[in-house]
Amino acid sequence: MSRRSTAEKETAKSDPIYRNRLVNMLVNRILRHGKKSLAYRIIYRAMKNIQQKTEKNPLSVLRQAIRGVTPNVTVKTRRVGGSTYQVPIEIRSTQAKALAIRWLLGASRKRPPGRNMAFKLSYELMDAARENGNAIRKKEETHRMAEANRAFAHFR
């Protein structure tokens, strides 16, 4: 066994404008090819768009959207005796939040082309805050899969 102590989890840093960790997590997930300033610009434009459309605090809309998309359980593929099973497992809150952010960004990227990413992201966040949209559908689909495969929960 290793004698080294386990490394402490580094807490996520907060972004410069909203001073929020969620926004920074979103920026780091939207980041492509190391262009962080572009990622920040996309997020801040999306937040500004949310502010104009809903006249609410964009941070509260973001929190509500992520809370709505965050899954409680997920399915993991497990191979037992030559056959594979989708085994439902509970996931930790940090992992669930990361999944929610990934689903939100994936759903906003899949929105019809023609508008920029900030526009698509803002509409996906507003939809998720209102409990509809593709990211919410993805969460419900995952929960349905977990419910359907509940019989295999003992394979953990």
From Swiss-Prot:
Part of the 30S ribosomal subunit. CDD domains: uS7_Chloroplast (cd14871). One of its GO terms (cellular component) is small ribosomal subunit. This is Small ribosomal subunit protein uS7c. GO terms for biological process: translation. One of the primary rRNA binding proteins, it binds directly to 16S rRNA where it nucleates assembly of the head domain of the 30S subunit. InterPro entries: Ribosomal_uS7, Ribosomal_uS7_bac/org-type, Ribosomal_uS7_CS, Ribosomal_uS7_dom, Ribosomal_uS7_dom_sf. GO terms for molecular function: rRNA binding; structural constituent of ribosome. Belongs to the universal ribosomal protein uS7 family. HAMAP family: Ribosomal_uS7_B. It comes from Stangeria eriopus (Natal grass cycad). It is found in: Plastid, Chloroplast. The lineage of its organism: Eukaryota, Viridiplantae, Streptophyta, Embryophyta, Tracheophyta. Pfam families: Ribosomal_S7 (PF00177). The keyword Acyltransferase does not apply. Gene3D superfamilies: Ribosomal protein S7 domain (1.10.455.10). Disulfide bonds: none annotated. Coiled coil: none annotated. Keywords: Chloroplast, Plastid, Ribonucleoprotein, Ribosomal protein, RNA-binding, rRNA-binding. The keyword RNA-binding applies.
